[in-house]
């Protein structure tokens, strides 16, 4: 039997969750359809209505419950699933001996920041072996701007005896392209870190399903 002939649950058990389409994953989450609409058709209808899985995941309770077959119970389950994913990634970082590459941090930042409706600036504080000391959302802004104070970042880094930091913020517009203001801010934070001998690892911008890394840009420019 080919993968396309398997039902979603059997396909997951045979090939793993990453082999499933968004529709199939949602069908498993919904478990059952409604009268006159099998679960796979219901899942397709939900995705068509919202436009994407991301839009479904960011919908508020009122919008979520507008769809026949979706209710408060499913909304609560979905929010719990999202939170478990966040905590899993946070614990993965906490358990890592070192964060030698930013990819785990990028995954975590995407989970934490991608769905924020306003700009949020977040910092990971690392020890001298690149192990996570703490994480903190330090600054909150509007839909297109957050005021960031480098001195407050440095103050917190010294307070927790951090040897390095990774910073990130989101672009609620979904476009992760770095603006001139983003570049200027990065240089200010770098300079502040240099003064107190705290290593600046990277500044990551989170968009919708995408990200921009200043460190990756620097690497590609030099190679």
UniProtKB/Swiss-Prot annotation:
Keywords: Hydrolase, Metal-binding, Metalloprotease, Protease, Zinc. A motif (JAMM motif) lies at residues 169-182. Pfam families: RadC (PF04002), UPF0758_N (PF20582). InterPro entries: MPN (IPR037518), RadC_JAB (IPR025657), RuvA_2-like (IPR010994), UPF0758 (IPR001405), UPF0758_CS (IPR020891), UPF0758_N (IPR046778). Residues 98-220 form the MPN domain. One of its GO terms (biological process) is proteolysis. GO terms for molecular function: metal ion binding; metallopeptidase activity. Zn(2+) binds at residues 169, 171, 182. It comes from the Bacteria. Belongs to the UPF0758 family. This is UPF0758 protein HD_0732. The lineage of its organism: Bacteria, Pseudomonadati, Pseudomonadota, Gammaproteobacteria, Pasteurellales.
